[in-house]
């Protein structure tokens, strides 16, 4: 999820995956961000695309377990650090696929059919991303035609402030955010949407590491065969992206939505996976 041709680059953020042994094989979970560095030199990115740059990051990690608690150690030249790891993060990694309930914490909007056909709904104010807040957009979608530019969700005002989620070329979903001064954007991996099929999409915007991830049908985007990264960065100055406080639902969608949930926090990958397994 961050492999760079130069092994000394692309190490921020750091990811953690949990393995479970079954029938002699280790089955690995979808990864979570476990550590990140806010040093600007290690957070470089292309402002036009969101594509991460070549910044460095954590080195030589070790996992320590003692009396049911966990830590990760890491070093940078002459500096060494020890980080306690939230045990619930590890527990969620190991239980991925077994949890099949919808996450309720932070849920501020939950629309099911027929309310998805209302066209426009009130959107509660979203957290300030520049202050470390986050948001997640979680929906089920079935497209009739896979063409770029179909608007799935749109909270933008007349000045362009807000969020828009739309289809993009090569079977992708794209999010664009604007606070009036700063913007951020990222798209899912290619060919993840197939016309006529139901897909679950979770877009996770985390104002801690300033990272956008996509979890589609229970799988965290990793860039596939066409990109080094499956996640993108946005400016640490990007703040309030609520926009008009009205959310237009599927204004130009050639298809239909089966469920829409918006959270006023970032979801863990494991929570997005659980929402997928919970179904529509």
Positions of predicted regions on the chain:
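Loop/turn-rich, solvent-exposed surfaces of beta-rich toroidal or solenoidal domains
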Residues: 1-39
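Short loop/turn segments immediately following the C-termini of beta-strands
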Residues: 1-4, 75-77, 206
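Beta-rich catalytic cores
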Residues: 12, 57-59, 135, 197
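Hydrophobic/aromatic beta-strand positions that recur at structurally equivalent sites within the blades
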Residues: 17-21, 83-85, 215, 263
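Conserved blade-ending motifs and adjacent loop-strand segments that build the rim/top face
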Residues: 23-66
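Beta-propeller fold detector
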Residues: 26-36, 93-101, 225
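Blade-level signature of beta-propeller repeat domains, shared across WD40, Kelch, NHL, RCC1
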Residues: 57-107
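Extracellular glycan-associated modules
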Residues: 102-280
